[in-house]
């Protein structure tokens, strides 16, 4: 086998690969053996037609396709390795010369991984990020805990007020025609929650049990249903019951009921400690994003369209999987959002391009700094992942499984973490 490489465009090369006539003839024999049962010639049993008779009656060309594919499978990868070509996508194959007793010559047009030109990535200046935990943050958490543990009781007298729960029957109309999905019975609507269309809940304030009212609203332009987007609607609403939330007192007894602590002060201290840790993690992630963005912005790389398209497809598959976990399909998602597959892919393209560039640039930094993952680091990362999904004896099994089946992914994670650490340590 011989292979020559020509660069024909940015990130595109053409390999001209020659397979010796002897090897091609062997491939023809294998093609004959593979397809022998398909040939029917009078005087011969099925599957027993000699190769020379097949060539005579059908023409040797009938064996070419499988023979050519076998030769490509055997030589294409070798040609890539010999010429240090890293392909992004499947090649475009063109057969140049083919014939029995002749060399097979074919061309493979290959889109390659782009070359990254790194800019400054050490000694960068990035504004520090930090978040303070305020007393009102803890008070809000306590208020949320109160609301979750509130008793709900029927309001015997009075009218609907903000914060009440109005149990309602409703039916929606557009142009005096009832629309699908616009009807509900005994629906508990918390006034002020913002769970219904803007200005719906406010119009119920002041109503008594048994009273009805026409509530006029306008659906948002991007409501998610084409037949409702931006349209005015009328809802016939009847209040059937009014309920109020009785909040528990914020005291030591409350702390004992909702946590493992004996006093309210201990609960507050725990909430604050967790909030501090959460803010530190949030700040760290934002700092990481700032550093990565700076490194990526300083680098230059021409990204092949094939890489962007592949990332878009990955994003679509990821969305489809997440929707499936909620019992939804992509088609339902398009209907709810008023989108289409083409619109969604177009929307995703910018983010896909940024992600591809980020991955390429960060990998280039890792390579430039000769950052490697040790066996100990890989095992530690595997243990970290395993503990998230298992415990006890199962953890050890999962560690072994990860080290074998997901080694490349673990290595990528470790290298990325070490690269980020190096970038942080070099900040001014």
UniProtKB/Swiss-Prot annotation:
InterPro entries attached to this UniProt entry: PPIase_dom_sf, PPIase_FKBP_dom, Trig_fac, Trigger_fac_C, Trigger_fac_C_sf, Trigger_fac_ribosome-bd_bac, Trigger_fac_ribosome-bd_sf, Trigger_fact/SurA_dom_sf
Signal peptide: none
Residue ranges of domain PPIase FKBP-type in the record: 163-248
Disulfide bonds: none
UniProt keyword terms in alphabetical order: Cell cycle, Cell division, Chaperone, Cytoplasm, Isomerase, Rotamase
GO molecular function: peptidyl-prolyl cis-trans isomerase activity; protein folding chaperone; ribosome binding
Protein's cellular compartments: Cytoplasm
E.C. designation(s): 5.2.1.8
Primary site of residence: cytoplasm
GO biological process: 'de novo' cotranslational protein folding; cell division; chaperone-mediated protein folding; protein transport; protein unfolding
Catalyzed reactions per annotation: [protein]-peptidylproline (omega=180) = [protein]-peptidylproline (omega=0)
GO cellular component: cytoplasm
Record note on domains: Consists of 3 domains; the N-terminus binds the ribosome, the middle domain has PPIase activity, while the C-terminus has intrinsic chaperone activity on its own.
NCBIfam families linked: tig (TIGR00115)
Free-text function comment from the UniProt entry: Involved in protein export. Acts as a chaperone by maintaining the newly synthesized protein in an open conformation. Functions as a peptidyl-prolyl cis-trans isomerase.
Family: Belongs to the FKBP-type PPIase family. Tig subfamily.
Record-given protein name: Trigger factor
